[in-house]
Amino acid sequence: AVSQNIAYADVDGNIGLQTCAGIPIRIKGDGLMVVPGWTGEYEWEGIVPFEERPYSLNPSTGTVSSANNKTTDEAYPYHISYWYALHYRIDRIREMLNSKEKLTPRDFMRMHTDYQSAMAQDFLPGLLQVIHAHREELSPAEASALNLLRTWTGTMEAHEAAPAVFDHFYVTFVRNLFHDEMGDSLFTEYTRSSYLSRYAVDKIWKNHGGIWVDDIDTKGTEESLEDIIWVTFQDVVADLGKKLGKDPESWEWGKLHTLTLSHPMGSVKILDRVFHLNRGPYPAPGSFHTVCPYAYSLANPYHVNHGASQRHIYNLADWDKSYVILPTGTSGNPASPFYLDQTEMYLKGDYRQDFFSVDKVKETAKYVLILQNSR
């Protein structure tokens, strides 16, 4: 089964986070690469006992949180994985959790739809420094794009232009770093696994360079990180000008970054036309690096393929004051009024009440579905 971090809370005020996974105890290696299977030197010695798997119970911080991030430090004796999300989303989550002594359901609603990018705030100083060093060379469009970034707060709103410049810079930067060494086929496969390329980019940025920086297609020249940043920025302005028009102020992120809700049978065009199975594209805020994750593959940029499949806020003091919203609806039947009827609410950050008591469930039910054995 897929490994999970399970968050826990109960009516007595206890909270916890438990890693639920079969973590192998390896004689040798970390499971990342292909190894000889016939020598016995890479065998497993068993599974880490449940009591020794990472957990947190009633921590002194008063909160537990998880965003696909690494939950152990270097002292943890067992190797779990390299397959973690970068720290930016969990950093922002913890910043918001610590911002108030007491949090309300409305605060958690705002957290669910938070588009502030800690990654953008981390990358911007270095990016702006390089562009500023070339300020005498800037075209009018480049100067306008620079101004968008310079005055930006780092919030990935769909109606703003700066997010389009920033994320397109990131996507183009990944290509300019790796494509010359990898070529088309390997680069496509590499960027399908977004965690790998994101970790590599983060390390290169923080170390101010690395073996991938030099463009091997420019013979006799060894590029620095600053060279690649400058070339990438020029590429971005030229490319967005072709995609979204000549005026950088009109480069709204939601024109580039979209969400389409696709039915499993919606790929059959005649069925989609007749039954209106697919919906969208909708302009999408956020990104893979925001707490509200409208994420996309670097191999197919800006087409949202990952996000919150449900948003829940549970009130353990009064279960009937809990909240929920889905990106689609409670029915998979296109003829149902409950097919994709929550999408607009989901995109706006709105919620429905989520009832648990028998009386409230019966009172608010639209209909009752009874499944009977025919025998």
What residue spans do the PLM features occupy?
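C-terminal/peripheral segments of proteins
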Residues: 1-134, 138, 147, 151-375
